[in-house]
Amino acid sequence: MANNIKLSILTPQKTFYVGDVKEIITRTVEGEIGILPNHTDLVAFLTPTETILVEEDGSRKKVFTSTGILNVGESEVSFMCDASEWPDEIDIQRAETAKERAEKRLKTSNNIDVKRAELSLSRALARIKTKND
């Protein structure tokens, strides 16, 4: 039995993170999920969220993860997501502006793409939470 999980977080632009962790807490379309070593195999769709990585020494790292796919194997986990950022990489003003813009679009009924606006709002809120927590 492995005591750690080999984690990879990949975005279209780069390999964002590769390392060993003890636990991962994230959110899928089905809800929040905690992943420990020897977790049941799983493939799930990710939603924008603050993901928590618990390192070998018990310390916690926060990371923003966007929409994508989560692949869980016995001792390996892969995030393949549109974007991923550490809290210090998040432009809080840009996230606040995106939040306000999405909220305005959702309040108007002028032929908007509601799903797109909801997703924009979700991404902005997750970035803000990751930066401010």
Curated annotation (Swiss-Prot):
Disulfide bonds: none annotated. It comes from the Bacteria. GO terms for molecular function: ATP binding; proton-transporting ATP synthase activity, rotational mechanism. Pfam families: ATP-synt_DE (PF00401), ATP-synt_DE_N (PF02823). Keywords: ATP synthesis, Cell membrane, CF(1), Hydrogen ion transport, Ion transport, Membrane, Transport. It is a peripheral membrane protein. GO terms for cellular component: plasma membrane; proton-transporting ATP synthase complex. Coiled coil: none annotated. Produces ATP from ADP in the presence of a proton gradient across the membrane. F-type ATPases have 2 components, CF(1) - the catalytic core - and CF(0) - the membrane proton channel. CF(1) has five subunits: alpha(3), beta(3), gamma(1), delta(1), epsilon(1). CF(0) has three main subunits: a, b and c. NCBIfam families: ATP_synt_epsi, PRK13450.1. This is ATP synthase epsilon chain.
